[in-house]
Amino acid sequence: MENKTIVKTDIQIAQSADIRPIREIADKIAIEEEDLEYYGRHKAKIPLKYIDEEKIKKSKLILVTAINPTPAGEGKTTVSVGLCDGLNKIGKKAVLVLREPSLGPVFGSKGGAAGGGYAQVIPMADINLHFTGDFSAVEKANNLLSALIDNNLQSKKHNLNIDPKTIVWKRVMDMNDRALRQIVIGMGDKNGVVREEGFNITPASEVMAILCLSQDFEDLKQRLGNIFVGYTYDKKPVFARDLKAENAMAILLKDAIKPNLVQTLEGNPAILHGGPFANIAQGTNTIIATKMGLSLGDYVVTEAGFGGDLGAEKFIDIKCRYAGLKPDAYVIVATIRALRYHGGAKKDEYGSPNLEYLKKGFGNLCKHIENAQNYGFQPVVAINHFATDSEEEIKFLKDECAKLGVHAVLADEFMHGGEGMRDLAKIVVEATEQQSDFKFLYPLEESIEAKIEAVAKKIYGAEGVVYSPKAKADLKIIKDLGFDKLPVCIAKTQKSLSDDEKKIGRPTGFDVTVRGFEFAAGAGFVIPILGDIMRMPGLPEVPMAEGMTIDAEGNISGLS
């Protein structure tokens, strides 16, 4: 294996890559050139006609998740990219299927989100910025509904008698901007009804969740029409269909519903589509993109946001349930750095070797392994390799996983791309060939309380669930509206298995508290809210945007 020394930034590596015309990537997965909808030479949209339900049944779906992350993240996307490249290295026809990045985190605290090192999707700058305009389309569709709501409030002929104080629908923008969380609109003469309003970030929009859970265009329209807006003055529910909004919203999404084809640094096909967050929504790419990948490749590598307690749970209990899919392999990304953190290491300590911290933090990984087993999987652990990992620590982690009957394999994609992922790829292929006793955590027929309890006890490790008075009142409304047979999409912190971000490692003896409920009638899930969840993030003290530059030739630096 060639020993590469990383001296370049991610964007420098991406800019120096031998990027191929997208038609060559399409050829690898048998997409006809006349069917490609080009966005320049290196990006294209794929028509939905390439979804093949019979082929889907024969292909293997590999889900990549992670332990609870440190603030820096644990490289789940990087491992996913590397695993796809590794599978292709060992002769498998693998396709990568990921979410699209949000501009908010790109310019905020995270920077780019297209992988890292020698395991990236390209064109990296395009992907991290406007890409093919899908997020803009979601934003416009969301805000069209907002405009129709406010227009109806002052309509004299077609007024639905909506009580402005009950409107739950908010405008969105794909930027971190705390100043827009709570605003007042309609100020001034004849400018509309004055009311309180606010902005969410675009990935938090229900339109994004709907796009990602829709099976086709008709399903998309129906779900858009089912969006709950608020109540009339006589307490009747109002939906987007009552405002005749669904067709116009769908028109704005007519291209956004088509998946985007790009490539990895090694020239393997990557489909990027959709981008809901996993702490406040389902955190996975679109059903359409996943099915497209399974139709075009023999193996699909996909990821679910944050740790297994958030993205993976929602991937399985929401996305797979609606899509009729099930993963064939379950990969948990773990870093020794993060396990030191879960063992009590401080920010200035978890980047240095320390076996004692690792031993104390191993419980977090152990719980995520148990969670995979709750679904009937025997997971594979990918140890995302950092230069600060000691041989002693690596051996400890492999040995402890082996005691649980689980393969733990070093993932060296950051330094070596697909070549550094051959061993992991072989183990994952073996995992896809094993029979799993797959099962959901709960049946839909159960009560909302029983569903929450199933997730809280089986996945988080909680003793029980406590409901605030507001949560009890919200729950009655949900039951009265007939939405209690939907799956639950629990909104909580990604930093802990519990609902308290300070409880790192593997907390025990705790209850989780449901503070309130929201429901996404269009997307098709109920949202129990655990803790304080921010739907419009703010920028950090020193945002990533301040370190970015662009020269006279349009070359960008500082994007990652």
Give the location of each predicted region.
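Flexible phosphate-sensing "switch/lid" loops adjacent to ATP/NTP-binding sites
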Residues: E2-S560
